[in-house]
Amino acid sequence: MRVATLSIALLSSMALMPMKTQAKIYAYPRADEVIITSGTKTTRTALDPNSIKILNWNMYKGSNSSWENDFKSLTKDVDIALLQEAYLDKKMTRVFREHPTMRLEMATSFILASRGYVPSGTAIGSDVKMTDLGYRISEPREPVIRTPKAVTYAKFAIEGHKEELLTITIHAINFVSSKKLMVQLNDIAKVVRAHKGPVVWAGDFNTWSKKKLRVMHELMAKLELTEAPFGPGRMKVFGNVIDFVFYKGLELRDSYVLPEVQGADHKPMVVEFYLP
């Protein structure tokens, strides 16, 4: 999302369309087609506990001209990439497929039928084999266009540790009340509560109101997840930050934003963790 006003204008224009016209714009995958796999075979079976480097980035569908080069550069030096607004048009499909080190798994939120049936969703990439992979489709839908948001999650083994790392990438439902946002967040919280081990939950939470920020932070506190601190540069809507990284069961070594990267409207965020 570039700015809120553009998205609101889109919703307004959609509201004027007949329902049959809107139905032709979006399609939805069968359950066995939600996950789309790209990239290469993984080269490692476990994360190095001395350094676990994770990228969080809403890629704005790869629309900006420098996205491809930025994506290749950013993913070269991280263990895990937690991605939002993955958009498997010809360009992004090629870039994902040709990635030299990462295997990428995308959970499809919806398919843009009007643009040649292009799947869009959230994705996790890594050169480490995933021990588990799953997704959640939001029960709440965006108003008017009636599209859901998919959350992707994956687990990774850690060398010398019995417990695995759970990673979650979210692109939260947007033009809804804080109550409907909480429906989506609480659904994902079930995955967190069921996991015994360290957790990283990151993404675009679409917390563009104070109330949404409050309910998100209240839930993270209940889950005993800590917010990673970042300097200036994160995406804001109506003056409120919407991109976050939360974690538990890990030691934080570093966290920073890369404001100079122009590959998307959101700025990439990088965190590095370790386990003693």
Where do the protein language model's features map onto the residues?
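Active-site-proximal beta-strand/loop segments in catalytic clefts of secreted hydrolases
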Residues: W57-Y60, L83-A86, A107-I111, D127-V128, ...
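Active-site beta-strand/loop signature of hydrolases that rely on acidic residues for catalysis
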Residues: I52-M59, F71-V95, L166-I170, Q184, ...
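Structured beta-strand-rich core segments of catalytic domains in phosphoester-bond hydrolases
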Residues: K24-K41, I80, Q84-E164, P259
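Bacterial N-terminal signal peptides
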Residues: S7-A15
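Metal-dependent phosphoester-hydrolase catalytic domains
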Residues: Q22-T42, K155, V192-G197, N206-P276
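Positively charged n-region of N-terminal signal peptides that target proteins for export
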Residues: M1-T5
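Acidic/histidine-rich helix-loop elements
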Residues: S51-W67, F110-S114, R141-I145, N174-S177
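Boundary/entry segment of secreted carbohydrate-active catalytic domains
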Residues: Y28-S66
